[in-house]
Swiss-Prot record:
Required for pre-18S rRNA processing. May bind microtubules. One of its GO terms (molecular function) is snRNA binding. It comes from Aspergillus fumigatus (strain ATCC MYA-4609 / CBS 101355 / FGSC A1100 / Af293) (Neosartorya fumigata). Pfam families: Nop (PF01798), NOP5NT (PF08156). Residues 463-475 have a biased composition (Acidic residues). Residues 437-591 are annotated as: Disordered. Residues 453-462, 476-486, 505-515, 557-571 have a biased composition (Basic and acidic residues). The gene is nop58. Keywords: Nucleus, Ribonucleoprotein, Ribosome biogenesis, rRNA processing. Residues 285-410 form the Nop domain. It is found in: Nucleus, Nucleolus. This is Nucleolar protein 58. It comes from the Eukaryota. GO terms for cellular component: box C/D methylation guide snoRNP complex; nucleolus; small-subunit processome. PROSITE patterns: NOP.
Amino acid sequence: MTLFILTETSAGYALLKAKDKKLLKRDDLATEASTAEGVSNLVKLKSFQKFDSAATALEEVASLVEGKVTPRLASLLDEIKDEKKVSLAVADPKLGNAIGKLPGMSIQLVADSTTTDIFRAIREHLPTLIPGLLPQDMSTMSLGLSHSLARHKLKFSPDKIDTMIVQAIGLLDDLDKELNTYAMRVKEWYGWHFPELAKILNDNIAYAKLVLKMGMRSNWETADLTEILPEELEATVKAAADRSMGTEISQEDLENIQALAEQVVGFAEYRQQLAGYLTARMNAIAPNLTALVGELVGARLIAHAGSLTNLSKSPASTIQILGAEKALFRALKTKHDTPKYGLIYHASLIGQATGKNKGKMARVLAAKASLGLRVDALAEWDDDATEEDKAALGTEARYNLERKLAAMEGKPLKPRGVAIGPNGASVQPRKFEINETRSYNADADALTGDQPASKKDKKLIEEVSDEEMADADSNEEPKANGTKDDDSSDESEEESSKKHKSKKGKDAELEKMAEKAGLSVKRYKRKLERGEITFDADGNPSAISKKELKKAKKEAKKASKGDEKKRKRSDDGEEADNGEKKKKKKKKGEE
């Protein structure tokens, strides 16, 4: 079978014919094709179709990248269309599939790893195979075509620059770390001068602003803190400054502390501005993804994938575990369960779900996010399209997911994490309020008034035994005024007195028996209930220890086992006697 090789170059299409029909099956192909003479001995030029201009070259190569067969390439392949038993080697499998679908093209296509060595050799020694093509011209044409192709792929649009999102979310994370470090340093540094302030103020930004406003704690009388703190908290801070236990510092120390506090306040203001910028860019570039997972989670997903286009090409299963690569490969290596979620775990919809529904919600949310990403990356909108139209898919999907989550949980949704409304707009956070931290109430230790604490012992709760109520006589007839006769009341009093006497007598007997047994009344009652008290012939009680009880139980078990064995033996003997009697009867009958 004759072998042809299709080579795409920056100058045009080259169709080469192999001199050996079994060229691709040779083991020494790589060594022979290492030189220009070796390549010339292996293949020869069948035909070469040159590009007319740089624009034509760009169109042809762009079509090849997308896996399309251009008319120019189709006309070149018509030269080998009528030949029988022909195979064509192609470098790109996608292009090979497109060539195979051409009408009337009965050519066996080869686009696997066996063609790698021959294509590498052809690219290295292409000027020697094509006459009139200089190496300098070839490099110049390749460079110009690569630049044109890069500009064509980019399709520059200021609204679709996802690089800004990648840089913004990275800077936001770095700012959070630096801001936290600097704020902690300000607290530790200024805490030597005013240690009580850190317990009163939890907010780092308010702490830094107060350091800038008040300076030395001795300025608490003249400092106006109403712009930073509410009135109650301001009074608490001034009272603490008046009786502070901190050390004194110099003016130079204070200037350095205030310089660091200025950095904290500046970073906080810039962070707020950067967060607003990131929200605006996410709503412009990926409105559907923002509506589903929020701007922060969406920006981290885009940054992790590298670009919006790369993320849109990922399937839902990849988006679900994006950011948990270490856990995934560790689970695959150890053959354990793979993780259910990665960066998408921080989305508000997954945060609202309980533990049993988090994995299911992550899977559904990732599927909807993958659809929204493809719309964000590939959809082309008119100039009249509004932001609501662009985010319609994500808004509707979020609304359906919220309803599904409510059905799974069986309770109304509570806003958590990234708050996105059903219309796709982000809910503004609540106004920041500084709450006073709980302090120790020393007044609670003082006694009420000047009176000493009472030393009266509390009465213990007495146990009263339940007494049986006497049944009322049915024969008693009440009087007209609703009262009973005096005789009945006297009888009930006599009965109750008899019961009290009988109870006292029983208690006295129990005490006597307990004394004889050498036990207290409670222990005697307990042992009597458990069966650990025995009586001799005279009726004197004696306590049995637990060891003796265990021994007695073991002996009883042994005795019962011995009786069972004797019964079994006797039963076996009777069965044997009965069997012998039956045999004798049979013998007599036979005789």
